[in-house]
Each structure stands twice: as C-alpha cells, then as structure tokens.
Swiss-Prot record:
Function noted in UniProt: Responsible for synthesis of pseudouridine from uracil-2457 in 23S ribosomal RNA.
SUPFAM superfamilies recorded: Pseudouridine synthase (SSF55120)
Recorded catalytic activity of this chain's protein: uridine(2457) in 23S rRNA = pseudouridine(2457) in 23S rRNA
GO BP of this protein: pseudouridine synthesis; rRNA processing
Keywords: Isomerase, rRNA processing
Ranges of biased composition (kind: Basic residues): 1-12
Superkingdom of the source species: Bacteria
Gene Ontology molecular function terms on file: 23S rRNA pseudouridine(2457) synthase activity; RNA binding
Species: Yersinia pestis
Pfam families, sorted: PseudoU_synth_2 (PF00849)
Listed name of the protein: Ribosomal large subunit pseudouridine synthase E
Amino acid sequence: MNKFSVKNHKVNRFSTKAQARQSPPAAPRRVLLFNKPFDVLPQFTDESGRTTLQGFIPFKDVYAAGRLDRDSEGLLVLTNDGKLQARLTQPAQKTGKVYFVQVEGVPDNDALTQLKRGVTLKDGLTLPAGAELVAEPEWLWPRHPPIRERKTIPTSWLKITLYEGRNRQVRRMTAHVGFPTLRLIRFSMGNLSLGNLQPGEWKEITDV
C-alpha cells in the first residue's frame, strides 16, 4: 500500500509540472502605433549595426504588421495579436493604407488615372488605388537628412491609397508613370493613423 501511495504521489507531482509547462500564462495583448523615422529598420536586430526599433520600443514581444522600408517614414503598427496582423496585411482583407508621397515633377491627369486603374509592374498588375494631387501636408515634419532636390525640377505631393502590400510598391508605381518618389510617409492603415505622433514617438492603444 505504501509503495502505491508513493508512486501515485510522484505521478501527481509530475502531471502538475507538465501542465504548467504546457500552459504558460498568456502574454498581454499589445498594439503600438509608432512613427518610424527615416533610416530606421522595421525590426529589432541588425547584424550590420544599423538603427533598429530597439532604440525606440521597450517591448520585444511585438512585430510589425506589414513592412515599412528603411528609407520610408510614418506609421508602423507593432503587435503580438496575430489576428490583427492578418487583418491589416493579408491581401484578401484589402485594408486601405494611406501614403503621402513627395515626387519629382507634377503628375498630370493621365499619370493619376494610371495609378488609379492599376499599372503593370514586374510582379503583375496592381489593384485599383486612390491617387490625388494634394498640397504639402500641414503636419509635415523635417526629414533628416533632407531629400535631394534638383533646382530645375519642381516637386509635388500625392495622396495614394493602396489595398495591397507589395515590396516597395508605391515607389515602383510612381516611377512607372514617370514621377520618382523622393519621400514616402505612411499615414494610416485601416482605422489606425499617426495622429499627432512625431518621429520616434509611439503610443499603446487598446480600442482596436
């Protein structure tokens, strides 16, 4: 009887430990909105020593929902919520992403129509997009370093809304219609926007 009791006791202790290992406490859900500065990689580590999110974000359990290239600025959504990441980035969701884009030259109606209808890039025809000529945004912050402008060629601003997310898509689209991108700022993804965040600033939100 004693042998059985001891054996049973050991089994119960083992089972409790196994359950504890199999069911770790769930990490708190986090959703951060970050205004990524120019020349910052959208990741926490880099073997080449370039500037990453590590210098700005104190949490390491979040990941970027969609890319924002090193030479682009603006809204980066960081979260550990897989469902939210999918909603913001999966092509089938067609979540609108708004960009303010400074281009070389002044696009005419033909160029804007091409952007709206879709242009054929190396990876295929782009989805219809929003594209309009706008004034320089009032909330615009200075970029460091500033863009390189040619004195003989004017620049202008476009507001472009994409419903897909290909690699460097905005830059390739504007170049395709003859107006290279000089500066690219993502302002919003779905109903999430920069608001009044300045470069390098972030905030945590819960109502999403």
